Swiss-Prot record:
Source organism of this protein record: Mus musculus (Mouse)
Source organism phylogeny: Eukaryota, Metazoa, Chordata, Craniata, Vertebrata
Gene: Ndufaf7
Disrupted gene: phenotype observed: Embryonic lethality.
Molecular-function annotations in GO: enzyme binding; protein-arginine omega-N symmetric methyltransferase activity
Disulfide bonds: none
Reactions listed under catalytic activity: L-arginyl-[protein] + 2 S-adenosyl-L-methionine = N(omega),N(omega)'-dimethyl-L-arginyl-[protein] + 2 S-adenosyl-L-homocysteine + 2 H(+)
Protein name (database record): Protein arginine methyltransferase NDUFAF7, mitochondrial
Amino acid sequence: MNALVRRCVARAGLPCIWRGKCYSSGNEPAESNQVTPMLRHLMYKIKSTGPITVAEYMKEVLTNPAKGYYVHQDMLGEKGDFITSPEISQIFGELLGVWFVSEWIASGKSPAFQLVELGPGRGTLTADILRVFSQLGSVLKTCAISIHLVEVSQKLSEIQALTLAEEKVPLERDAESLVYMKGVTKSGIPVSWYRDLKDVPEGYSLYLAHEFFDVLPVHKFQKTPRGWREVFVDVDPQASDKLRFVLAPCATPAEAFIQRDERREHVEVCPDAGVIIQELSQRIASTGGAALIADYGHDGTKTDTLRGFYGHQLHDVLIAPGTADLTADVDFSYLRRMAQGKVASLGPVEQRTFLKNMGIDVRLKVLLDKAGEPSAKQQLLGGYDMLMNPQKMGERFHFFALLPHQRLHGGSQERNACQSKTPSSSVAGFDELVWQ
């Protein structure tokens, strides 16, 4: 069996629950009522200073340096709490690799580019993209490519290093260095690790954020007869070892994030996502490139989407904090507003539409023709179904892009967010392509 087919088949056989499977605030039966170190930390914090916002709760639970979920655990894959698209099929990463090469060509073939991934998981997606770069070596031979990974988890950065470099990459000894790990991939491309996007060197860059924005902390608000009230996390007075949601008695500063014409009864807002989008927009407007964001979410229509995942099952977000992943749907309308017209935005489009436009059917046929065994073909089709089926990932995940205005409209002036949605130039994945 062809080596590429074997890699694809191996991933297609994984059992999967995707984090966008359903929308829940986390009221399902909990897997565990244990008093975790994180729960003790949070209860002490709340008893000392008062109830905390949902955003602060998520930040502590996921990224606390001592007890955070993402800091020390490998939560991906069959033994983790969820599986992502790159873990299901290599076709996914290959098509994204083609997208980045397509944008590099369309923007004028810069002599150098940085591939920057935010939250790279196990490094699987970057590895698949790099394999495409190697296969297109004749096209990219004059381009100096470097990889820059933004990762807060030391555990995951070590796994990424093994995936990309096939060896352990030592930590940088210079305490003042913005890079905390540096190495070379199997194909000879330099790779560096950072803890913050702002630490990545500026220059022509292609940015990738796959299932990254959904784990950023959100503020939750509920409309009441007295106006908007923010949702907080407090200690349950009926059970000293449990937490509960409460409403703030009065307005809070974060209420400023709510749109004046908001009509929903419940709203989730992610200021951190806005800051990152503004940083990406400024960089792309100044030095060129593009950003591709793939996540599950909505275009300003959904309400209460915060939920937890533990062992591939839905998990109450307030039970055993620090042991389960917390996630909330991405509001793409908010991301579009935060770009502030500095760059053009495309999408969101459903994953099945994007992948079909990128030629997933053509690529699947090639792999099926090379897979001689019936079981291998069945697994390839299973992976395809998981990515494309509307009831699975096909309609739940969406793609969204940021591009320079001149890439779409032939001008350099800033435009407002509405204008950026109607490009005059075709962009792979977001426009239907004719395959010969």
